Regions:
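Conserved anion-binding
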Residues: 85, 97-173, 184-187
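Hydrophobic faces of well-ordered beta-strands that scaffold small-molecule active sites
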Residues: 22-28, 47-49, 75-79, 98-100, ...
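Alpha-helix-loop-beta-strand connector modules within alpha/beta enzyme cores
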Residues: 57-92, 116-121, 146-148, 198-220
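C-terminal helical cap(s) of enzyme catalytic domains, especially alpha/beta-barrels
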Residues: 64, 106-122, 247-264
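Conserved, mostly hydrophobic/aromatic
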Residues: 26, 39, 50, 98, ...
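Glycine-rich, proline-tolerant flexible connector loops at the mouths of alpha/beta enzymes
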Residues: 35-63, 182-198
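Short, acidic/polar
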Residues: 28-42, 81-89, 160-172, 225-230
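N-terminal amphipathic alpha-helix/helix-capping segment at the start of soluble metabolic enzymes
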Residues: 1-25, 29, 137-149, 206-209, ...
């Protein structure tokens, strides 16, 4: 059985998260599809391609999703701020989930959801030809019927404004979950005094976000700049933790090898 055939038989990312599995995604900022594919071939459950602060473009996302799929894993795409058109394009390219940054109110959430879901739930237009090729479905009718359920929309919660409107955002039809960005959240929580993804004062709020998602029947995801925090986030109720950026992995790996070479 090929990796592609095996991937088609595996539960979707959405199904695994909704079943309560705790998953870990790698984080890809480098636009070379081979890097994303190599990360996917490790033990990560998914690979996130970052267009906001990473260096991914439309072309590299197209190729990166294919590389991740070739390794039998689902791809997640973080779009730039306000680029909801790119959310639809990422889905057309075969993304299993899209993360939208700076969703601060219901209007933002509705616009994002509209781009992510087909009518009548949303306004996504038809054109997922590449996604159909990469999917487990053999015909477009089945794909159409299942797409809204099998692809996930994560609204990023990064500001006090978003936190204050959290339940309203979670209540929007077509928003499947929230994704916390602890770095930006720490800036907001400290009123611009510091950037500290591990800021102790904001941890009760971070935990409250996961609890609110659970209460509303939605998913909670978060970025862990320090992989050592992943376990704590899982205990809070976060089902998806993204970590291990490719740039940091490259630097740490090279530094370790250099140290060993000099020691020998």
């Amino acid at each position: 059985m090929s990796e592609d055939d095996n991937a088609r038989r595996q539960p979707t990312l959405a199904a695994r998260l909704r079943a309560g599995e705790k998953l870990v995604s790698a984080w890809s900022g480098l636009p070379d599809p081979l890097v994303a594919e190599m990360l996917a071939r490790l033990g990560f459950d998914a690979v996130t391609l970052d267009m906001q602060h990473g260096f991914h473009s439309t072309e590299s996302v197209l190729r990166g999703i294919a590389g991740v799929a070739l390794a039998g894993k689902p791809a997640i795409v973080r779009i730039p701020v306000g680029r909801f058109d790119m959310a639809s394009r990422a889905l057309d390219m075969g993304a299993s989930a899209v993360i939208a940054p700076m969703i601060n109110d219901v209007e933002d959430a509705r616009a994002f959801a509209a781009a992510m879901k087909f009518p009548p739930l949303g306004e996504r237009s038809w054109g997922p030809h590449r996604a159909v090729q990469l999917s487990r479905h053999e015909d477009v009718s089945t794909f159409m019927r299942t797409a809204d359920r099998e692809t996930l929309s994560f609204a990023m919660i990064e500001t006090r404004k978003a936190f204050d409107r959290l339940n309203d955002i979670l209540d929007v039809d077509g928003i499947d979950g929230v994704f916390v960005g602890p770095a930006d959240f720490s800036i907001a929580w400290s009123e611009g005094a510091q950037v500290d993804p591990g800021l102790k004062e904001m941890m009760p709020a971070i935990e409250a976000i996961a609890a609110a998602a659970e209460k509303n029947g939605k998913l909670a995801a978060i970025f862990a700049a320090d992989p050592g925090r992943a376990g704590r986030y899982r205990q809070m109720g976060y089902r998806l933790v993204a970590t291990a950026s490719d740039t940091e992995s490259l630097v740490l790996g090279a530094a370790t090898l250099l140290e060993r070479a000099k020691a020998g």
